[in-house]
């Protein structure tokens, strides 16, 4: 693995992506990451037996293993001695299936079978990529109407390491994919300022699901409630924390035109419109 150490020392990169990881032996990935994590700080002095000093660096690695079964993905991760993460392909397929089901998808199963839920510390979550996009070699495109919902899942939950697709952010004119920059910027700001604290899941309905984050003391006014629907929409009673009792929350996505009051138990009746996404934070808080 001398070449791997040379490459790391020359480029000083801090991570690697292994394309088609299913064709790369797990032992190779393990040895490669271990080699690039400890790079000689200086060459061995000529004519001496003095060993070179090594500098340790935390190298991030992710494998692109296009398989819907988390058992295969976790097996590969384990075989690398947990040196690599994996793209959450099962979650992507859930997004795709929900987006093309015309309201017939069971939203309670949206996270079922995903790395996000099964091995969150090793899950690199994504919505689409260069292979799943329209015209891609593994086309399984997540329809545009569902993109806000899918990105809310990977950006506003505590599990997973989210990855944004440049094709969604900037658009792909060649295949008539419009930019989602405005809504993605809003979700990124929500992640940075408000998506903190204990999480409570409400994936208990076929059409309307959601979760809340209670916030923490380190991030002023943090905490939020997310509710989404692939059907006619509706309301969902969710617990956001007793510390918010009496506070008014507003939907920063602009889909609900009214604010709600959190009750004495720390719960609110959070609304979402048809095939929509609503993200509720304390009223008058800014992005």
Question: Model features per residue range: what roles?
Answer:
Residues 2-287:
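Active-site-proximal helices and loops of the catalytic beta/alpha 8
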């Amino acid at each position: 693995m001398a070449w791997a150490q040379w490459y790391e020392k020359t480029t000083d990169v801090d991570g690697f992506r292994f394309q088609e990881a299913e064709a790369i032996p797990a032992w190779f990935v393990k040895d490669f990451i271990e080699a690039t994590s400890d790079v000689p700080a200086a060459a061995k002095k000529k004519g001496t037996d003095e060993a070179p000093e090594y500098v340790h660096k935390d190298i991030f690695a992710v494998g692109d293993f296009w398989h819907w079964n988390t058992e295969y993905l976790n097996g590969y991760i384990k075989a690398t001695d947990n040196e690599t993460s994996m793209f959450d392909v099962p979650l992507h397929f859930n997004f795709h299936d929900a987006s093309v089901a015309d309201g017939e998808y069971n939203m309670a199963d949206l996270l079922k079978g995903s790395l996000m839920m099964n091995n969150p510390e090793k899950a690199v979550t994504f919505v689409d990529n260069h292979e799943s996009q329209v015209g891609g070699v593994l086309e399984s495109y997540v329809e545009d109407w569902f993109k806000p919902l899918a990105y809310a899942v990977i950006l506003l939950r505590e599990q997973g390491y989210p990855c944004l697709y440049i094709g969604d952010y900037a658009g792909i004119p060649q295949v008539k994919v419009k930019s989602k920059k405005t809504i993605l910027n809003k979700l990124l700001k929500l992640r940075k300022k408000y998506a903190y604290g204990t999480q409570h899941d409400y994936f208990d309905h076929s059409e309307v699901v959601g979760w809340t984050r209670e916030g923490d003391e380190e991030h002023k006014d943090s905490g939020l409630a997310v509710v989404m629907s692939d059907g006619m929409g509706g309301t969902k009673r969710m617990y956001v924390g007793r510390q918010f009792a009496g506070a008014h929350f507003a939907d920063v996505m602009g889909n609900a035109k009214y604010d709600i009051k959190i009750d004495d138990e720390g719960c609110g009746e959070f609304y979402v419109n048809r095939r929509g996404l609503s993200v509720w934070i304390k009223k008058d808080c800014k992005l």
